[in-house]
Amino acid sequence: MRFRFCGDLDCPDWVLAEISTLAKISSVKLRLLCSQVLKELLGQGIDYEKILKLTADAKFESGDVKATVAVLSFILSSAAKHSVDSDSLSSELQQLGLPKEHATSLCRCYEEKQSPLQEHLRACSLRVNRLASVGWRVDYTLSSSLLHSVEEPMVHLQLQVVPAPGTQAQPVSMSLSADKFQVLLAELKQAQTMMTALG
């Protein structure tokens, strides 16, 4: 069977397996869990202490807690990516075996944060990392046994790259001849023009 929140594909087996785990907790606690997972998806961080307290009554092991967070994260982010409305999501989750009040509770939480979640996912998609800053300097070598001509300029670039949101910037250094720098600059401008057109 195909589901819209899975991109009109079959639901992954691991998600099917975890639906029964979600049914073990109350619908109120499921809603509170969803709000924590949505905070994580929106880049605001997750409170694992709160999650452990919410799942304590169901006597979840650490693997169950992680699986619960993972399945909620998958359902919410996948539904947002595929622009599924909350009524359709509720219906599909009930088809997978999630009790109606649990599905309603999850979908109410999803509906409240659907727009900001889609905006955040759009901003993060197709990004490997972000450029925090660029430093550069040009050196003129007056004489060297390695260079063919005297006074050939060298461009030294220092990029500060943030690999993922919330992580420290890492330096990436490179040295280029003036010719190679001109080629790099032209290609970067061309890429920027193409990205702006996609916009």
From Swiss-Prot:
Keywords: Cytoplasm, Nucleus, Transcription, Transcription regulation, Ubl conjugation pathway. The keyword Phosphoprotein does not apply. Its main location: cytoplasm. GO terms for cellular component: cytosol; nucleus; plasma membrane. It is found in: Cytoplasm; Nucleus. Residues 130-199 form the COMM domain. CDD domains: Commd4 (cd04752). Pfam families: COMM_domain, COMM_HN. The keyword Nucleus applies. InterPro entries: COMM, COMMD4, COMMD4/6/7/8. Scaffold protein in the commander complex that is essential for endosomal recycling of transmembrane cargos; the commander complex is composed of the CCC subcomplex and the retriever subcomplex. May modulate activity of cullin-RING E3 ubiquitin ligase (CRL) complexes. Down-regulates activation of NF-kappa-B. Belongs to the COMM domain-containing protein 4 family. Component of the commander complex consisting of the CCC subcomplex and the retriever subcomplex. Component of the CCC (COMMD/CCDC22/CCDC93) subcomplex consisting of COMMD1, COMMD2, COMMD3, COMMD4, COMMD5, COMMD6, COMMD7, COMMD8, COMMD9, COMMD10, CCDC22 and CCDC93; within the complex forms a heterodimer with COMMD8. Interacts with RELA, RELB, NFKB1/p105. Interacts with CCDC22, CCDC93, SCNN1B, CUL2, CUL3, CUL4A, CUL5, CUL7. This is COMM domain-containing protein 4.
